[in-house]
């Protein structure tokens, strides 16, 4: 975990709480996404590491964002500039979307299989995970032929390794102990 992630959490939480109170989660998500892209820009990155005053930096950043960021979003940008934290905007955006998904009871699940899974198999995996996790599940599927067979499922901190490679590794560990 990077230092910027730790720095970003309180800003993301404040933006998230405000957005929930105002019923503007999607709007804030769009504003933060735009501001994060601006912060990632190479020229803007040079500005963020320059010796401009915090006030001037905030003024420039807000001007670049223009109408994409409302007055409340501009206030967040100004506070972050005053504290020298504009470089953390991409992490603030990421943390905001983590909070948003948690709030909306959604979770991204990575499904890695040895071969392409059928729609029926994916629907079965999705429904079982939704029941177990009590969340709406979004499956991100990929193929890794080195698994030999089976699947690996990653959902947040939960990892289910039901691959042939995983089973062989567990068997090997059991035989060696």
From Swiss-Prot:
It is a peripheral membrane protein. Belongs to the ATPase delta chain family. F(1)F(0) ATP synthase produces ATP from ADP in the presence of a proton or sodium gradient. F-type ATPases consist of two structural domains, F(1) containing the extramembraneous catalytic core and F(0) containing the membrane proton channel, linked together by a central stalk and a peripheral stalk. During catalysis, ATP synthesis in the catalytic domain of F(1) is coupled via a rotary mechanism of the central stalk subunits to proton translocation. HAMAP family: ATP_synth_delta_bact. Its main location: membrane. It comes from Vibrio parahaemolyticus serotype O3:K6 (strain RIMD 2210633). One of its GO terms (cellular component) is plasma membrane. This is ATP synthase subunit delta. Keywords: ATP synthesis, Cell inner membrane, Cell membrane, CF(1), Hydrogen ion transport, Ion transport, Membrane, Transport. The keyword Cell membrane applies. GO terms for molecular function: proton-transporting ATP synthase activity, rotational mechanism. InterPro entries: ATP_synth_OSCP/delta_N_sf, ATPase_OSCP/d_CS, ATPase_OSCP/dsu.
